[in-house]
Structures are given as C-alpha cells and as structure tokens.
C-alpha cells in the first residue's frame, strides 16, 4: 500500500541523519551557477555502466556524477523510538520557528449563537491603501514566488532566508502573525486606533477559496473594544449571518483557568462590500471584541484548528501504546506533492488465518484542509474504535476498518481552505488518472479497488465540513429508478436514519440528500458508489451548531464533534445487528414517509415526490460536497419553483386554448350536435352496483324511414336498471366496403325504447342503446320511438369536408402535434362506439333464401336488402387497448334466423369466399367467425358470457340435428356467446321449428 518508487524522490531521506545533505541538494537544484540536474536516478542515465534501477541515486559533485544507494522507504511513517517526520513546505513559504499548541477544553455550558440586534454597522474602507500596513505575509522578494503557475518543490522549514519582522510602530498597535502551520492571513491594515482591516490569503496557486482564517495577535490591551473586519470573502451566504461567532484562544486563559477555544464577538455582521474587481464581488465579516488580558498572545480562527502535526502526535501515541498497536497498523499510503506522508490505518482484531468473511468499512477525512471539524469527528471515531469497550471489540471482531485520517496534508500545512498544492480540489479528481498530480486520491481509490477484490466493502464515508448549513447530515447516492429498485432506493437511507435516531440533537435526517449530480461525479462518494459500494456517503458537519432538540441555538464544541464518531460506530452496530428489528423498523418508517409525501407532486412528472425534489438540488463547487439550501421549510418552496421551471415550455395558454377549440370545432362539424354515450358507472350516483358479477349488455335497435304499414311493437325483457340514469347516444357505423362511407346517427335523449318492426332501410337507420340487467328476469315492456337521421350522402359529404387538418375558422394549417391529438381523439371515439354497440336479434322466420344470399353478399345487401339484420356485439374488456384502423369497415356479430332447408339450398360453400378477404386483412385488430346454429339452442337473456378464443381464421359450421358441417378452413372450435332470443312478438319459438342460426362474430386481437 506504499507508494511506488519509480519516480525521482527527494524526500525518502527526510527523516534520516543526513537531512542537511538533503537540504543542500535542494539548494543546488535552485542555484543558477551549477548543473541544473544535481540528483538523478540511475535509470535516467544512458550510460550502460549503470544498471537500470531506481535504487541508485546520482549526485553531481565536483564535475562528476557520484552514485549512492537510495535510503529505505518509510512504510510506517511514525515510530515510538524515533522523531516524527518533519512537515515539508513549499520552498518560498516563510515559517516561524515557534510551534503553536493549544489545549483541549469543553465549555461548561453550550455556547449560544449570536442574536443580531439590528444595530450592527457595515464598515467600508475605501481609502485603506493609504493607511498603515501592520502585517504583510509576502513582500516584493516573494511576490514572484507566489505567482508561480504551479508547485515547484518543497523543503523542511520552507524559505531559509531571514524572516521579516511584523510592523511595530507604537505601543498600542496589535501585532499579527500567521506564518505557522495551518495559519492564514495575508495582510492587515490599521484603519483606526483600534480598528483593523484584514485580508485572508487565497489557496496557493489559485485566486479564490478565501474562507479559512487562523492568525495570532499579540500586544493586546484589556478593556478596549477592537474591531476586526475581513474584507475578501467570496461566498454570498455564510453561517455568520445565522449566528455563528469567531473562535478565540488566549494563552493566559489557558494557563490560569485552563480555558481553550471559545466563541466570542459582538456586532457580528456578514455583508457585501464595494471591493468588487473584474466582475467579482467580495463580502466582509466584521466583529468587535475586548481582550481579557493585556500583553497576551491570542488566536482567532474560523473553526477549531487541527494540524498535520496534531495528527502525527496522535498516531505516534497509538503506535507507542502496546495494546492499541496490536489491532491498529499504521502505514504510509503515499507521499504528497510536497513529500508529506499520507497515512492509512488498518483497524481489526488480528486474524489467525486469512478470513475473507469480514466486511470492510472505509473512512476518509480532511480532503478539504479548511474543514477542520472533520478531523475532530475522525478523532472521536478513532478514540472509540480503539477503546476497550465491548462494542468496540465487537466492531473490531466483525469488520476491517481502513482509515485515511488526512487526505490533503499539504493543504493543511500551508493553510489552504479547499485545494492541494496542485491548485485543484482533490474531491473532484477521484476519477483522474494523474497519479503524480493527485497522489492521495489516486492511491486511495486504488487501495479500495484492491480491497474490494478480496472482501465486501459494506460502507464508505468521507468526512467534510459545511459552511452554509446547520447540524450534521449526510449525502448519499441514488441513481437507480425507484420503480425498478424500490427496495434498494430505501435501503440507502436506512443508515442515515439510524444515525439520526442515535444522535437526534445534532444529526438531521431531513437535511440528507441522495442524488448524483453531474458536477459531483468526481467526488469520492460518487466514485465509490459507482465502483460498487452501495452505502457510499459524505458526512457533512456544520461550522456553526445545531437547530435540533436541546442543542438548538448553540455552537458545536470539539466534544460534540467527537461524539459524532461514537454515534457513527453505534449506528454501524445497529445496521449490521443480526437482530434485524431496528433495520426493518427504519425501513417501515421510510416507506411511511414515502407514502405520506407521494401524494404531494410538485411537477407534471408523476414519479417525482416532494422529498425527491428537496433532495435533488446541490451546491456548486464553491462549497463542500454540499448544498446551497437551508433547513427551513421555505427551502421546499424555493426548490418546488425550481423544479417547475425545469419543465420545457412549449406553447402559451392562449395557443393551447386555440388548439383545443379548433379540435372541438372540427369534432362538432363531424358529429353535429351528437355526443357520446356516457358510461353507466359515471352516471351511478352512489357507486354501489349489486350486479357486480353480471356483465354489461347494451341493446341497439335499427330503424328505417317510416313506411305506411309500419307499426310499433314492444321488445320483451328490456327495462332500465333501478337507481341508474341511462342515456342514449348517436353511434357511427361503418359500411362493409371501402366504397361506402361512415353513417353517422343522431342522438336520442328520450329514454323510452320503441322498435320499428317492419321494412327497414339500412341507409337511414339509427341506433338506440339501452342497458339491460342480467341478474333479474324482465317482467315488463319498454317502448322506444324512432328518430330519423340525415341521409347517407349528406353525412358522407360532411365527413369528407371535415376530414382535413385545417382550421376553417383560423385558416391556418395544423401542426403535427395537433394532427396527432386529433387522430387520437377520433380513435378514442371509435373505441367507445365499438365498446357500447350491441344489436338485438330479430326473428328471420318466413324469410326467403334470396334474402340470405343478399346478406352474405355485402354489396348487394347495401343496395337491395330491405330488412336490416339485427347484430349482436360481444362486449369484451381487454387488458391491452386496441385501436381500429381508419378504413376498416365496422362489422357486428349477427344472428340470422332462416329455415334449414332454405339455408342448405341457397348457401353454397362458395358463398363463404366473399368473406375470405376479410380474413386476409393484414395487421387488423378484428377477425370474424361465421357459423350456423339451430334456433332451439338460443336461450333467453339468462345466459352467461363465455370467452371466445382469439383466432385469425374464419370457421363456418352448419348445425343440423346432431351433425355439423364444416369447411376446410375450420381450425378451431370457438366458444359461443349465447344471446337473448328476441322476436317481433312475444311468442317463443318451439323446438320443432328447427330454425338455423347464422352467426358472424368479430374477434379482436389484443
């Protein structure tokens, strides 16, 4: 797991006794009067005398190359017997010799946040350049070095020139210093007797990320109100506007009262100033403060400092402990650009054999150097997992922990807020292949990849700090579809929910987010999730405090942050507990949350719930792997408006209304004043249908133009169902041939049913529809009047005139979308017609054989036949909707009565050939069956519906007595729907009549 040594290495001898020789080599490297290459590996020399190896170093001394062996690589980094590895700085950085140390201290009571009074002032210093500069981190000699485009090399102690002393004009001027580890302060200007303008240094080799400050103040005077104003912040929003106070440390207070870092300040204000340059805007932070002691050495900081030296001291203590060192192995993962060590810890109970059943847990921290709160959480985690409690032992026995406590030591040392010495954010480069530029994240990813080949990694968590939100929360990953993997969708939220239950006063589950943004694809969280780690999280800890429970309105201290490490271990035990009661309890709560919020839709996308939208918006790259949102409910409204604005805008409301009006006008031109039949379930007021098992039956009656001898007859067995309101509607019937156009029938709103029983002309027919109950035998008669319609040729011409996709009112052509909408509506109307049409059966007794021939011949029937066949449609519900073709003629199942002898004499097998083209229609949704059946087999309206198998073939059978005649085309025996036997009179035919029923049935393919 240590770094490869194939490249040129200056730092392997950094902890050896010949450290001075190493420093001299660097001085020779930058000197102009000697050879530019003073130290090379043997494999870079073309002389065959030297073997190709990386273990021999060549030094240029006295005009010749002198070989020597490379020192052994330091795999352990820390040692209980030897000194710690010294920190290495960029060669141009000035570093004071004094080592800064602080004590740890916990306030007796939680420190409250600052409550604005409204009297805070916003100081502006337009003429600060003319005032006295009391501190400047870089002078003219170092300006060129700071403007280097990239990092060059490093050395222990940084710049070796004499340090420039701070300005000390008079006795009452404060003395500032920040040239120590993790310090950050670039310039201080004294604008008044007790007022100072401060400028923090941006990250090295960048011109941004001015957020972290940490500096020293001496020559203080007690009982004097000082004002400090930092003028070059770049974030528009800050926790200082929400009550966060700066941190203060007094050495005298630490010595006399054992008090460490504490929150201080009055008149705290974060505001926009007028120092914008090149289109950039800056923000100022101002506060006032009275020092507790005179001639004191004090410190101000953005958050509790935790330096690289603090980490080394902590790891050295672990290594020197005979108990903890047994189950905690410290190794060097790699070296940074400045040749500082990146440590990796392996924590587990020693394995007697190679046990691959243990799952792995990975924790990393401090990829952003200014987020020091992540190091305090890591310290709390290590304190607990290395302790002697029973839960800690159980965790070590169950898991293998891989811990990288500080991913960016270079940035921590120089006081950066976000970047490494490469000038880049490491948490956006986990996908990079540049091992030399981003070694810590490259080797971390490689280590995890190799670990996953041996064992399962159950959880990955990267610790961060957040500068705009309160509390502690998590970011997770959820790139899968909820509808397909709902279980996984909820399982990724179980661990954060458990964490919120174990520490409800500091962890907020409502602030957690579980989405993958494109701008975050280079983060460790997303990369590890894509590598196969299901529980991949970023733990975000606020710089301020909590808004939850009894911690509400208070700042987080170091102990609060350390306690988060303990709660993390406790939640890990709950998550992997063999007793899955807590697991399923959290899963059930998540399901209830989803059900509760699923009804609240914030956009037209029905798959997006409110909780998903609130978890979708994350911040830009200026913050941590975090969000710009806050914890208030107004954020949901803001996000809701953002989600609605994401919808692509197509047309204005006026345009949409115009399109809808045009479609309605065209439909009215086609159908006249008619309307579609309402469904019976829509007209049911109470919604209780006692006929739940009975199918719906609709009876359609055909009428003709009134003749002199036409009379009115009653139809037995038809009555309205009680409690229902039935309506009649005009229906459209297509002819049997493409040459005949649509016949559109007028609407009848009269609920009384009457049937014209004698000569009926099909060209002037009108369908009347009524719904019949099937569970009770009818006992009365219902009359139905005939309503004439328009002539066939008039309706045909009207349909032709309105078939164009051009608006007659606007005179504009329709778009493709409008045409598609219009066609869809026409198809839907045709489906309604085919669904509700159900003709009745009339008696065909005493009919001539010529009439049967006319019925079989569709063209002749349309022109000559004077008796319309009453058709029966088997109304069936299909699971898959079907769409009729535009020009397919409508056909109905028909039951025709005729004498058996007449049928056999007048219907040859060749007559069926006229129907064969109907069977050969390709890609049609309807097929036909033709068969004959004796009238004695036809029962009354008490029969049940039977399913008819789908078939693309036409079968014809003639039933006579017990014999069945079938043509060769017969391929299957279709089950038949028994239709009520209806005649013009109330007389039921006897079984001796021997009438044959001719049936033509439509089959629809789903």
UniProtKB/Swiss-Prot annotation:
Highest taxon of source: Eukaryota
Top EC class for this record: hydrolase
Catalytic residues (positions): 540
Cofactor: Zn(2+)
Binding site residues for Zn(2+): 368, 371, 464
Tissue and organ expression note: Widely expressed. Expressed abundantly in tissues with m otile cilia such as testis, lung and trachea. Abundantly expressed in pituitary and kidney, moderately expressed in brain, eye, fat, pancreas, stomach, and adrenal.
Alphabetical list of InterPro entries matching this protein: Cytosolic_carboxypeptidase, Pepdidase_M14_N, Peptidase_M14
GO molecular function, one term: zinc ion binding
Summary of the function given for this chain in its UniProt record: Metallocarboxypeptidase that mediates deglutamylation of tubulin and non-tubulin target proteins. Catalyzes the removal of polyglutamate side chains present on the gamma-carboxyl group of glutamate residues within the C-terminal tail of tubulin protein. Specifically cleaves tubulin long-side-chains, while it is not able to remove the branching point glutamate. Also catalyzes the removal of polyglutamate residues from the carboxy-terminus of non-tubulin proteins such as MYLK. May catalyze the hydrolysis of aspartate from the carboxy-terminus of target proteins.
PANTHER family xrefs: CYTOSOLIC CARBOXYPEPTIDASE (PTHR12756), CYTOSOLIC CARBOXYPEPTIDASE 3 (PTHR12756:SF23)
Family: Belongs to the peptidase M14 family.
Name of the protein described by the UniProt record: Cytosolic carboxypeptidase 3
Naturally occurring in which organism (per UniProt): Mus musculus (Mouse)
